[in-house]
């Protein structure tokens, strides 16, 4: 710890430095913060920092779960597959994070195609089980008056799941509550549940409908909740 004791009047940053050569497996350290101006026994907080130094070997580009989630920016894929009808291209600067991926030509539609462009991401899950996957996309609208704008995804080589990003399929998207909400927040969010295994997994994001622009993907274990924030969690560490 950069500071092991003292009194703070306004604020002070404490830096924790870890020598991983001295740690085998898992370890934890803690320090206490006490408010001296209120009744004894109240106003204290114990801060616990856990470290996992278990030896692992992941392929290059693998995102590692930490702090209860995995966050991957769209540009940091491990594989990209284009087809004769179109392919993903980088947009920069663009969106809330500065970069995004979009299929060109802009009117390319793969709804009825056997081959679709995709981006592949590699991540390491901490445990077996269900995970939430949340796709962060730009706040675009369908290119037709039909209330549909599809994306596709698959996990670990499984079947492609096609999802409509439009929530209400019985009314026009333009002017709907979702249209207004996405415009104000400047993001389109679509979420699903996927089955992962402990260790390395692969996730593919498929282009289906036109005008879909991917900015980020976030995963977290089922049964847990992400802290609320405007941009979502920062991008995770990758090997």
For every predicted segment, state its role.
Residues 1-239:
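Extracytoplasmic
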